[in-house]
Amino acid sequence: MSEFPKQAQVVIIGGGVGGASIAYHLTLLGWKDVVILEKHELTSGSTWHSAGLVGQLRSRANITQLLGYSVDLYKRLEAETGQATGWKMNGGLRLACNPERWNEVRRQATTAKSFGLEMHLLSPTEAQELWPLMTVDDV
């Protein structure tokens, strides 16, 4: 932009993931007069320091669905915008070191399945075959 606008329909303070997401979604809805105010570069604050982890399964359905939407958005964002996002779906690992935790992980697997999320229950030996550096003596 060559000149700073004198007015805007929407002014978003902060160009982190929250502000950028609000601007993105407003423009998808057809809003044309949206400005982000950021004191440095976009996503250079707390967003830049984040690990970028997006675990999808949560205890509340609405949050799980929102995170699923986020993953779908991140998957298509690079093709849609032409901007490299660096998005990679690597998965995660939940460990159970006692019977109570194992029961909890099994319940989570059932919940994940109900949301259409992929989750596999592995024995300690199977986990170690996938991650050889992992010590499984107490898993």
Model regions and ranges:
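Short, flexible hinge/linker loops that cap or flank conserved catalytic cores
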Residues: S2-P5, L28, W87
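Hydrophobic alpha-helical packing residues
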Residues: L26-T27, A112
